[in-house]
Amino acid sequence: MAESSEPPVVLLHRPPSLTFMDEILTREFRTLITDTSSSESLPSFFPRHASSARAFVISGRLPVTDELLSHLPSLQILVCTSVGIDHIDLAACKRRGIVITNAGNAFSDDVADCAVGLLISVLRRIPAADRYVRSGNWAKFGDFQLGSKVSGKRVGIVGLGSIGSFVAKRLESFGCVISYNSRSQKQSSPYRYYSDILSLAENNDVLVLCCSLTDETHHIVNREVMELLGKDGVVINVGRGKLIDEKEMVKCLVDGVIGGAGLDVFENEPAVPQELFGLDNVVLSPHFAVATPGSLDNVAQIALANLKAFFSNRPLLSPVQLD
């Protein structure tokens, strides 16, 4: 790639609160910053200010459509600060010759920690017990109902990638028996492999969802899966909300078809089914599994490394395969 006397123009789009990329990019590039609170629409802003932008850094879940890309004629690389890329029209990027990078393993430790935290919270009923004490009910009514032990649980992991592997290692420390379902069997994995999620659910007490959202994994956890998991079964989701048929999950939780759920992601964020709010066997968090200062610093460094590599014609650190 030809050298230029001026730094390349990089476009950064982010929510107003996520400023962690601003300084690191402006030190290296001519950076244009837009945020989700702007009164000017992106199709209006781009032609007037960003037509020369060669890189587009997205912090958040902006839908990247073919129509949006049409307003960025100079764009060559799309840098996502998320691992999931289901908000991007991959076919349009491929057709336009735009390469894509994602966050790689920047969030894996923190998401795995959150998954384990949700599982412990659901099984031991920690948030419900906290509310019981704060409300004064302990003094009024005595002991709180018992939770379930974590140790020894059979845990099925859906998606044994980086995050799924980290979840497995953490839960091994609790004496949990790990098995998994993934696109293909991992020859180096010591865990039992199930080729379909129905068998995984039938032979486990817990399902932890760590996989990407694709056409194949959309609603991978449906009513049949939850019925096989059983009345004491628990679902933990730190992947994507649409991995679960949310309406059926709500019915299963209310009717006692499954025993509980720990959810960091939802089908129509930030909307959450109100039926979940009154259930003590459900623990909710606002899609924050990835969000710690350490992980945000990690992803900023990965994004910067990808940009530097691209503009120096070196291999990318975390490329997304479009084939």
UniProtKB/Swiss-Prot annotation:
The knockout outcome noted for this protein's gene is:
Disrupted photorespiratory flux leading to a slight altered leaf concentrations of the photorespiratory intermediates hydroxypyruvate (HP), glycerate, and glycine.
This enzyme catalyses: glycolate + NADP(+) = glyoxylate + NADPH + H(+); (R)-glycerate + NADP(+) = 3-hydroxypyruvate + NADPH + H(+)
- Binding annotation for NADP(+): L160, G161, S162, I163, S182, R183, S184, V238, G239, R240, H287, F288, A289
Gene3D superfamilies in the record: NAD(P)-binding Rossmann-like Domain
Q: Which GO terms describe its molecular function?
A: glyoxylate reductase (NADPH) activity; hydroxypyruvate reductase (NADPH) activity; hydroxypyruvate reductase [NAD(P)H] activity; NAD binding
Q: Is NADP one of the keywords UniProt gives this record?
A: yes
Q: Which Pfam families match?
A: 2-Hacid_dh, 2-Hacid_dh_C
Q: What class of enzyme is it?
A: oxidoreductase
The catalytic activity of this protein is classed by the Enzyme Commission as 1.1.1.79, 1.1.1.81
- GO biological process: one example: oxidative photosynthetic carbon pathway
Please list the residues that make up the active site.
Answer: R240, E269, H287 (proton donor)
Keyword NADP set for record:
yes
What controls its activity?
A: Inhibited by oxalate.
Q: Keyword set for this entry?
A: Glycolate pathway, NAD, NADP, Oxidoreductase, Photorespiration, Pyruvate
Q: Which PANTHER family match?
A: 2-HYDROXYACID DEHYDROGENASE-RELATED, GLYOXYLATE_HYDROXYPYRUVATE REDUCTASE HPR3
**Purpose:** Catalyzes the NADPH-dependent reduction of glyoxylate and hydroxypyruvate (HP) into glycolate and glycerate. Mostly active in the presence of NADPH and glyoxylate.
Similarity comment: family membership:
Belongs to the D-isomer specific 2-hydroxyacid dehydrogenase family. GyaR subfamily.
Q: Subunit structure of this entry?
A: Homodimer.
Q: What is this protein called?
A: Glyoxylate/hydroxypyruvate reductase HPR3
Organism whose genome encodes this protein:
Arabidopsis thaliana (Mouse-ear cress)
Q: Gene for this protein? A: HPR3
